[in-house]
Design a protein with these regions (language model features):
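Conserved active-site-proximal phosphate/metal-binding subdomains
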Residues: 81-99, 202-222, 228-377
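Residue-level detector of alpha-helix initiation sites
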Residues: 152, 227-228
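Active-site entrance/lid segments in N-terminal catalytic domains of soluble metabolic enzymes
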Residues: 1-216
């Protein structure tokens, strides 16, 4: 296969895999696609270790990094505010609500050493100042693409990337967003539709992709949101995209580090079992429906806080849930456990190796294109 994305990134298949698992990154890149490591939840030290491992594992194959540097967040109009000061802005009522959930669902507390670790890390970096050390680490490794997952990439991210020969990508949920990204110097656009897991906009992939393609041509566009098969890949390219950006589909692979309880939920879920909720990040993000999302939408909920206050508020609770949910006897934690995932979860009913997912997508893509071509005879 050959598209603009294949030429731009030096890959065989225009399949980009967004994942938080370094093993999936390596497997996809080695299979001819392009692995992108989601680094927002990592410390700079952890990112350094993972990128060094990936570089050695892929043997010269290309790979990239995805960060979350939102343009707007609590304290952004003040030039950024430290975690300690931000935590002081969390209302007592919200803290009481989260504590009440832990009691209601009998989620045991963390051991003291785990609790100290949570207090140090607080939450994933979701501000510019917190993301800079991650950028420093990323550019010290042989990445060829850096992506900002939420809003326009900061000017210095673009400048530093281009100075290092690294391409820059950005997600867009509207054509107007994509136009602004291109004007800022972005090299490729990820048109992410409403169906996607994580932070999404309001427009479905089928409508969004051609709108963005028309708005930013000749800049290459990746289609994202509800894509995990060769047929969906063929449809994306027919809409004008130059490749696909897939995230959810890797969460049930054998390499994935997805929480085992959550992975089992994914394997039995339908496409109706997700919703967009602010309950994890403070911004609308599609995730698996669970007792956690239901409680935040319930009549006793105080409502969610803006980013990054919501992640700071729930950091310890999420650690407690994840730790407890590994034991099926902790039924309350199992009910609460969830994670970001797109509507394609309804098709994620089998665990297989990540490289097999890539090759199956390519085979099905060929079959789909052949079928359409035969209609023209």
């Amino acid at each position: 296969m050959r598209t603009k994305i294949c030429d731009l990134l030096g890959i065989e298949f225009p399949i980009l895999a967004f994942t938080h698992c370094r093993d999936v990154v390596a497997a996809v890149s080695k299979a001819g696609g392009y692995g992108v490591l989601g680094a927002a939840a990592l410390t700079p030290e952890e990112l350094d270790i993972d990128l060094a491992w990936i570089a050695e594992e892929v043997g010269g194959k290309p790979f990239g990094v995805d960060l979350i540097v939102p343009a707007k967040y609590e304290g952004s109009d003040e030039g950024g505010v430290g975690s300690k000061a931000l935590k002081e802005r969390i209302p007592a009522g919200h803290r009481a609500f989260v504590d009440g959930l832990m009691d209601k669902y009998d989620v045991p507390p963390l051991p003291e050493d785990r609790e100290r670790k949570v207090n140090v890390s607080d939450a994933a970096p979701m501000s510019y100042d917190q993301a800079v050390p991650l950028m420093d680490v990323a550019f010290a490794h042989p990445i060829s693409l850096i992506v900002n997952a939420l809003g326009p990439p900061p000017p210095d991210m673009i400048e530093r990337a281009h100075a290092n020969g690294v391409k820059v990508g950005a997600l867009a949920g509207k054509a107007s967003h994509a136009v602004r990204h291109v004007a800022a110097g972005v090299d490729l656009i990820i048109a992410q539709g409403y169906e996607a897991g994580g932070h999404t906009g309001e427009i479905a992939t089928m409508v969004l992709v051609p709108e963005i393609v028309d708005a930013v041509t000749p800049v290459p566009v990746l289609a994202a949101g509800g894509i995990g098969s060769g047929r969906q890949m063929a449809a994306s390219l027919a809409l004008g995209a130059d490749g696909v950006w897939c995230g959810s589909i890797w969460l049930t692979t054998l390499e994935a580090e997805t929480h085992p309880t959550v992975k089992e939920k994914f394997l039995t879920a339908t496409s109706s079992d997700t919703l967009r909720s602010r309950s994890r990040t403070g911004k609308p993000a599609r995730q698996l429906r669970s007792a956690w999302t239901e409680e935040w939408e319930g009549p006793d909920s105080p409502g969610t806080l803006p980013m990054p206050l919501q992640p700071l508020l729930i950091a310890e609770a999420q650690h407690r849930i994840d730790r407890a949910a590994t034991n099926p006897q902790n039924e309350g934690a199992v009910k609460l456990a969830n994670y970001f995932v797109g509507q394609i979860v309804g098709s994620m009913n089998e665990s297989k190796h990540a490289d097999r997912v890539v090759l199956d997508m390519v085979d099905e893509f060929i079959d789909a294109v052949t079928r359409v071509n035969n209609m023209m005879e």
